[in-house]
Amino acid sequence: MAAPIKFPFRPRGGQPREDTTPKRGLRRYLLELKESNKEFWLSGHAVFKLLSLGCMISALDYFETMLPHPVLILLICMEAAICIFFIFLNTLAINRYIPFVFWPMADIFNSLFSCVFLGGGIYFAFKARRLLPKPYLTAMILMGAAAICSFIDMLLQFQHFRGLRLRKW
């Protein structure tokens, strides 16, 4: 086997650079946080999740001025809490540390069920009252806007599956 070539001069290109990313600790987590949530904020998921959350909170505020059925309050609070969970999950990059859950599929199902529950809540709110005062009607419209934002967010989630190939067993 031949000995490696020794150059009398320094070859062009210099030494290969070492990987400067931190291997552990807070600096590594902050770097991963910066890199991992760019897609969430720039692809439109965050905008529609925040719009949906804002509509749900506004609808809850309008419902609180009246005396609605307690199921409507419970429904909106539950959907808002789940929406906040997914916003924190994607913003803090926690989904990288829990690999046994396929998070894009969980987010699609969350958006689908949120759309269905909010639509059912609108139907229930409409059937629960004969007279629809202005704050009650406004809250129903805001619930509809939140359902539409959840549906659009569900459609945006399908981008995760474009390049995905199924395994053949």
Swiss-Prot record:
Domain MARVEL: 40-162
Transmembrane spans: 40-60, 69-89, 98-118, 136-156
Membrane topology: Multi-pass membrane protein
GO biological-process terms attached to the record: chemotaxis; negative regulation of DNA-templated transcription; regulation of testosterone biosynthetic process
InterPro entries documented for this protein: Marvel (IPR008253)
Cell compartments where the protein resides: Membrane
Superkingdom in the source lineage: Eukaryota
Keywords: Chemotaxis, Cytokine, Membrane, Transmembrane, Transmembrane helix
GO cellular component: cytoplasm; extracellular space; membrane; nucleus
Molecular function GO labels: cytokine activity; transcription corepressor activity
Family: Belongs to the chemokine-like factor family.
Protein name in UniProt: CKLF-like MARVEL transmembrane domain-containing protein 2A
Organism the protein comes from: Mus musculus
Record lineage: Eukaryota, Metazoa, Chordata, Craniata, Vertebrata
